[in-house]
Amino acid sequence: MNEKFVINIGRQLGSGGRAIGEKLAAEFGISFYDKELIQIASKESGLGKEFFEKVDEKESHSFFGGLLGLRANVNSEIYGNNYLCNETFFKIQSDVIRELAEKEPCVFVGRCADYILRENPRCVNVFITANTDDRIKRIAQSHELSLEKAQTVIEKMDKKRAEYYNFYSNKVWGAAESYHLCINSSVLGIDETVAFIRRFIEQKLG
């Protein structure tokens, strides 16, 4: 494929989504961006890296934040500052994603990249899921946690990712209609899932 294109990967924690994204980038010989976006956004904005790390893919708030479980007696000044930080972060990161997509073919993991690049016809949006037991085992092993703790971490992170995505995209995180392809990596395994997605991308983009 000679034209620039972008692969956007949404994923459940423990599904192998990041590994799949990295392998796709390697196979296509294109750039891969996940946490790397934080460093780029920090450099381009002049804001500290810790600012971006603090709000990266966390649940977002608005003045209608009661929908996310915020109480009415939250201090308005603090609440407003949190809102500003989240909105500023999202805008800066969105600008970086658009600039990178314009400059080169690449893979983005998370960060609402599929929504940010929704006007780009050369995008393929993929969501990676996996069986719950496989996810728990993968996180327990990679982070040296008990199975019980790994399950708790997965539930909390999935909730945060869903809130972040749903808030900014006005779509539903993980829902089939939000993506071009949803795939369970437990069915084929990581490497065969990569091969399947690659064939799908080549077929879609031609």
Predicted regions and their residues:
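Conserved phosphate-donor/acceptor-positioning beta-strand/loop module used by diverse small-molecule
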Residues: 119-142, 147-155
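ATP-dependent small-molecule kinase phosphotransfer cores
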Residues: 42-105
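RNA pseudouridine synthases
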Residues: 100, 113-119
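Glycine-rich phosphate-binding P-loop
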Residues: 9-22
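Short beta-strand-centered segment that lines the nucleotide-binding/catalytic pocket of NTP-utilizing
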Residues: 31-42
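Pre-Walker A (Motif I) flank of P-loop NTPase domains
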Residues: 3-12, 104
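Small-molecule kinase domains that catalyze NTP-dependent phosphoryl transfer to phosphate-bearing small molecules
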Residues: 57, 61-67, 146-190
